[in-house]
Amino acid sequence: MDTSHKHIALQMAAIILLGLLVSSTEIVGAQSVGVCYGMLGNNLPPASQVVQLYKSKNIRRMRLYDPNQAALQALRGSNIEVMLGVPNSDLQNIAANPSNANNWVQRNVRNFWPAVKFRYIAVGNEVSPVTGTSSLTRYLLPAMRNIRNAISSAGLQNNIKVSSSVDMTLIGNSFPPSQGSFRNDVRSFIDPIIGFVRRINSPLLVNIYPYFSYAGNPRDISLPYALFTAPNVVVQDGSLGYRNLFDAMSDAVYAALSRAGGGSIEIVVSESGWPSAGAFAATTNNAATYYKNLIQHVKRGSPRRPNKVIETYLFAMFDENNKNPELEKHFGLFSPNKQPKYPLSFGFSDRYWDISAENNATAASLISEM
């Protein structure tokens, strides 16, 4: 082979390699995104159909808020990784006695492992001293310890991480992100949890909603900043520039963790979403933009942690008509008839979900009401 042909061959090889790397990054990014499977609706499909929908749409991770037995049975052999919740209503019982935790783990984890791929046990959801769940705060850490000990007794501590899902009400200062810190009046609650999570090498699960921050302060927060569509840096924080609110919020949590002695802890975004109706700025277009951009964005990391994929769970799989207030009914990626509301992709970016059937159904419904 002469020199010119060798040069062309090397160029072609480099192009192919670059394409493979881009594809690999895209796949890894999509696979780091899961979807929360809530069940507070009276018109939702059965769990077996929901699991098939996850598989057909290439959604590889699921958050379950409680150990629904039909869902766990349907997940057998699915290869879907599961974040399984210990409901807030179970915290007092599990905190009271290690045997209660052992029974819970036996019934809901060991009976299904390894046919069901549990990734995390989320003990409690949004328990906080400054919200309506304040009465549960004293049970949370003992429940986490008992569940962790039960997981260890089952020999699964290297396979299944134990943590809790917290929300942004615990953050006192989030601007600029580098100055993120926990509220002084929650430190006695959160600091021991941070210490426990650090010792067992688990992530902290955090529910992050740019929607609520934007809707609560649209004067100072722009819609493009909340939707990942700002063309330029909006917040300059020292050497770090922020073009979207999601990054600013997640990096504020990292800064708060660092200040509380948890600098080595990873965060997993256990919920993030945007409603399509029911409140200010809750539109189908805004929700579609948010979800699409979030899926693409998390593979890039944040300014504080560039090129480090942010494991994220979209809220939620379906619109749930038994939730309140009104906007809580409209976070679904899918309508209860299993039709996607938005053209999203959990694989290659050119393979978007077909929403024509949903649009046709909506049009037919409107015509019938005329």
UniProtKB/Swiss-Prot annotation:
Catalytic residues, chain numbering: 126, 271
MF terms (GO), sorted A to Z: licheninase activity
Gene3D superfamilies for the chain: Glycosidases
This protein's pathway: Glycan metabolism; beta-D-glucan degradation
Xref: Pfam families: Glyco_hydro_17
Root EC class: hydrolase
Catalytic activity as recorded in UniProt: Hydrolysis of (1->4)-beta-D-glucosidic linkages in beta-D-glucans containing (1->3)- and (1->4)-bonds
Sorted UniProt keywords: Glycosidase, Hydrolase, Signal
Family to which the UniProt record says this protein belongs: Belongs to the glycosyl hydrolase 17 family.
Name listed for the protein in its UniProt record: Lichenase
Organism field: Nicotiana plumbaginifolia (Leadwort-leaved tobacco)
Encoding gene per record: GN1
